[in-house]
Amino acid sequence: KSQPEFKLTLDQYLKRVVTPLRIKIANKKYQQNKIQIKEISKFYGVQPRFLIALWGIETDFGRLTGGFSVISSLATLAYDGRRHDYFKKELFNALKIIDDGHISLKKMTGSWAGAMGQCQFMPSSFLNYASDWDKNGTKDIWNTKSDVFASAANYLKKVGWSDKTTWGRKVYLGNYVIKNKKNKVLTLKEWSNEGILKMNKKKLPLILLKARLIIPDNYGNYGFLVYNNFDSLLNWNRSNYFAIAVGKLSDSIKEN
């Protein structure tokens, strides 16, 4: 119940989750699934590299999906956890998924908190966003990659994703004076006027794309200007570290 608090810095976290090996595998997985993932990407309007990156960060490309019985996990948390109302609802959602024939009780496995399959959907997310891309009558986020990619793409699209932009960029703070205006949204041109520069210390593109500034703890003279798609990633997982990791991994995937 009580887990020790051990806070990684962003750099420590990124070194663990965006490794050279994971970057290599991500590019390989993109090539292996390219035809299918491009179709899904076009249909939903979510760039393929983000679908591969999410898959990689969430479950190491479907390798680490959790071996817990989702029903047992949710039942335990519903009656023993701090957020019992939430987990009770998720338990009933999970039972509905079984009742609808998408997966058997025995095969419904996931994390200790009830997140399921290769995209780690909670049962409520499954009911809202899961997709039967191969049209076989079941939304199989456990074993069918096309359903996994389409479900992730559908989720991002429905929470506001746009394939016209990316996630954000690392920036040099330069002469920027940190003020107490949290979550201030400005255009790149306005951020440039505030003294923020590209990593090579050249001027930002003077365009009207809106961004907000994130400065992680102990991050020296650097930060991230993040765009609207970053908030879609936060909707998926409310961690700046997670969203930055997905963004960084996606940047290293060559779409061709």
Question: Language-model features: where?
Answer:
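Acidic helix-start/capping segments at beta-turn-to-alpha-helix junctions
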Residues: 1-6, 55-59, 69-72, 170-175
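Substrate-binding clefts and substrate-entry loops adjacent to catalytic sites
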Residues: 15-28, 32, 78-81, 85-88, ...
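Flexible, glycine-rich surface segments
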Residues: 101-218
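Soluble non-cytosolic domains of exported or imported proteins
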Residues: 24-32, 41-48, 64-68, 81-89, ...
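C-terminal functional modules
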Residues: 201, 205-256
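Catalytic and substrate-binding regions of cell-wall glycan-acting enzymes that process beta-1,4-linked
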Residues: 8-16, 64-91, 152, 182, ...
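An acidic, Gly/Ser/Thr/Pro-rich helix-cap/linker signature
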Residues: 1-41
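Short, functionally critical alpha-helical segments immediately adjacent to catalytic or ligand/cofactor-binding
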Residues: 47-62, 94-97, 152-153
